[in-house]
């Protein structure tokens, strides 16, 4: 998968493409449904492009702490998006300047740089300054450019909305099985282990301080955003299973 990093409009790309747009934190079942819909629309000569945003707008603009933490920091998100069929990821840095982009500018100055036949987004998608513009406006703004727009309904399972927010809440409570049911794939923590401590986890949502069973043995999540592990030094990955009772 090709990855481009931009701060405002994407670079011009003449390749025919179908586009998806979103934060894609976790690349959960809802995201996968959007991606699969885009893949079903995409013609053989087209690529699947995704525009994603980092950091979360509510962290970038208002420093709301819970939105700093992610299910899948950048490298993990890229890995899952590639796995689910994205050919070109445009990773957009969300800043106060970017937040001033109007809906009209987003379409005329950003999307028209891409050779798009169709855009697929979630039904709750909003965009542009104030985030008060919806799929209907996106569809209207894209009509003059002959770009189709499809919205994918929100998915629920067991009366729980599949969303990154709900999955992060499950992780914080140590409910990993419930989180993975909404993710549709395993959830891993990847970090650097040195002298029995996994660090570099500042961007991850982590479960509460405690002792947990993982696929690599028992670990302790500390209150300073490190995990005590019995693993050799270097880059390691943990698959959390469940919290152990005291």
Curated annotation (Swiss-Prot):
Spell out the reaction equation it catalyses: FMN + ATP + H(+) = FAD + diphosphate
Q: Which UniProt keywords apply?
A: ATP-binding, FAD, Flavoprotein, FMN, Nucleotide-binding, Nucleotidyltransferase, Transferase
Q: What is its EC number?
A: 2.7.7.2
GO MF term set: ATP binding; FMN adenylyltransferase activity; riboflavin kinase activity
How would you classify this enzyme at the top EC level?
Answer: transferase
Pathway recorded for this protein:
Cofactor biosynthesis; FAD biosynthesis; FAD from FMN: step 1/1
Q: Which Gene3D superfamilies match?
A: HUPs
List each coiled-coil range.
Answer: none
Supply one GO BP term. Answer: FAD biosynthetic process
Question: Per the similarity annotation, which family is this?
Answer: Belongs to the RibF family.
Function statement: Catalyzes the adenylation of flavin mononucleotide (FMN) to form flavin adenine dinucleotide (FAD) coenzyme. Can also catalyze, with lower efficiency, the adenylation of the toxic riboflavin analogs 8-demethyl-8-aminoriboflavin mononucleotide (AFMN) and roseoflavin mononucleotide (RoFMN) to 8-demethyl-8-aminoriboflavin adenine dinucleotide (AFAD) and roseoflavin adenine dinucleotide (RoFAD), respectively.
Can you name this protein?
FAD synthetase
- Tell me what organism the protein belongs to: Listeria monocytogenes serovar 1/2a (strain ATCC BAA-679 / EGD-e)
What gene codes for this chain? ribC
């Amino acid at each position: 998968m090709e990855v481009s990093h931009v701060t405002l409009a994407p670079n011009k790309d003449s390749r025919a493409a179908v586009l998806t747009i979103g934060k894609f934190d976790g690349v959960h079942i809802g995201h996968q449904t959007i991606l699969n819909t885009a893949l079903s629309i995409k013609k053989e000569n087209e690529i699947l492009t995704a525009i994603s945003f980092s950091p979360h707008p509510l962290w970038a603009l208002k420093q709301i702490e819970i939105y700093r933490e992610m299910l899948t920091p950048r490298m993990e998100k890229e890995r899952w998006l590639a796995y689910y069929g994205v050919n070109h990821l445009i990773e957009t840095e969300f800043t106060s300047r970017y937040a001033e982009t109007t809906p009209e500018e987003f379409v005329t100055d950003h999307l028209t740089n891409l050779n798009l036949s169709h855009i697929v987004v979630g039904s709750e998608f909003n965009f542009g300054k104030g985030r008060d513009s919806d799929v209907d406006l996106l569809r209207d703004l894209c009509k003059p450019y002959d770009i189709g727009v499809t919205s994918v309904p929100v998915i629920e399972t067991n009366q729980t909305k599949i969303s990154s927010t709900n999955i992060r809440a499950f992780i914080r409570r140590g409910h990993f099985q419930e989180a993975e049911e909404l993710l549709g794939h395993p959830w891993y923590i990847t970090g650097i282990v040195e002298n029995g401590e996994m660090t570099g986890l500042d961007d991850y949502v982590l479960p509460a301080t405690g002792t947990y069973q993982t696929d690599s043995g028992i670990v302790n999540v500390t209150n300073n955003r490190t995990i005590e592990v019995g693993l050799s030094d270097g880059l390691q990955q943990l698959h959390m299973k469940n919290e152990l009772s005291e």
